[in-house]
Design a protein with these regions (language model features):
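Generic protein-terminus/edge-of-domain signal
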Residues: 1-64, 68-70
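Short beta-strand His + acidic residue motifs that chelate non-heme Fe in jelly-roll/DSBH
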Residues: 62-64, 80, 86-91, 97-98
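Conserved hydrophobic/aromatic beta-strand scaffold that supports enzyme active sites
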Residues: 53, 77-79, 98-100
Length: 212
């Protein structure tokens, strides 16, 4: 199902691409797998309530990330926080991995990595080449293999293992990014307020009694 805010599609991959995983906190698919379903010319869209990582091992991407344009050769990663609009185009030789994670798993991670900052809600979108980071590429190769295995099998502790692996991938990628609290946010004002409201509800709802 796609919702629209000012004609920007909100794509919920867990429901629209594969409804079997609609309730999952972590969703994994190859880049080529999603491209076969959605196409390689992705018009501007966003993912409400989800952080997403696109990691390209091969090919090149033309990316519009909020108001910034990128033309980057693999290996690279793109990290899009909830509600950050983005669009991209790739050729058939572009492939890699896509990790979609519910914001409730990433918010605490950002608060631990950047204590006292507002990055949990104000984080900009990121596009970064990893061509000069061979150690990170080796580590990520192991993580992707583990994530793909866990996601594709119904093993004991699957949900917890996927959550930990997803947080590890985000941590590794963020270590290679110079994020500052005063960085320009890619989140539009009204969507940022909506995110703040959602986060407050998520943190406080257990403190209140249900309405009869």
């Amino acid at each position: 199902m796609r919702k629209s805010t000012d004609f920007i599609a909100n794509i919920d991959i867990c429901k629209e691409y594969d409804a079997r995983y609609a309730a999952d906190e972590v969703h994994y698919e190859t880049f080529a797998g999603l491209a076969a379903f959605f196409g390689r010319d992705m018009q501007v869209h966003w993912h409400d309530c989800f952080f997403q990582v696109h990691f390209l091992e091969t090919g090149k991407i033309e990316l519009q990330l909020d108001d910034q344009h990128y033309s980057v050769q693999a290996p690279l990663f793109i990290l899009t926080p909830p509600s950050v609009p983005h669009a991209f185009f790739t050729e058939p030789d572009s492939d890699g991995h896509v990790l979609t994670v519910r914001q409730e798993l990433i918010w605490p991670l950002l608060e631990r990595l950047y204590p006292g900052s507002n990055l949990a809600l104000d984080m900009p979108g990121i596009c970064l080449s990893l061509a000069d980071a061979p150690q990170e590429l080796t580590a990520l190769s192991h993580y992707w293999a583990l994530i793909r295995r866990e996601f594709g099998q119904n093993l004991a502790g699957r949900e917890q293992t996927l959550a930990l692996l997803a947080q590890a991938v985000f941590t590794l990628l963020l270590r290679n990014t110079a994020l500052e609290d005063n960085a320009n946010s890619g989140v539009r004002g009204e969507l940022q307020l909506f995110q703040r409201f959602n986060k407050m509800v998520d943190e406080r709802f257990r403190e209140h009694l249900p309405v009869p």
